[in-house]
């Protein structure tokens, strides 16, 4: 199997150590290196940063209901991952949630994507 060359991160809240252990075990089992990306806890963000990331008014015009804090934190965590990619020289970034269940074929898929470079 070709060595995976795409960076891979998993989003994980500081308090969820069991989830971290589980995803790290799955990645190790598949032979994939992964880096923990600390998840954003929405309530801990300063209001000024919250307003840069989310607008209740814009959301209301586009969707049926406002996002709850957990959804906003998830969204902000993914933005953090995009920023990490943009700050790097990598052509792509694999972003996982810490509660994902990886299939045995996942490493092959990542390697196939990496081979497209």
Spell out what each predicted region is:
Residues 1-96, 100-117:
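An acidic/histidine-cluster motif and surrounding catalytic segment
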């Amino acid at each position: 199997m070709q060595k995976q060359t795409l960076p891979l991160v998993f989003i994980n809240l500081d308090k969820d150590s069991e989830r971290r252990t589980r995803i790290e075990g799955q990645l190790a089992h598949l032979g994939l290196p992964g880096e923990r990306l600390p998840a954003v806890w929405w309530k801990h963000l300063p209001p000024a940063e919250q307003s840069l990331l989310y607008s209740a008014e814009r959301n209301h015009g586009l969707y049926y209901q406002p996002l709850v804090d957990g959804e906003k934190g998830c969204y902000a965590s993914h933005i953090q991952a995009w920023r990490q990619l943009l700050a790097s020289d990598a052509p792509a970034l694999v972003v996982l949630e810490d509660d994902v269940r990886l299939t045995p074929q996942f490493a092959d898929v990542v390697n196939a994507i990496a081979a497209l470079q």
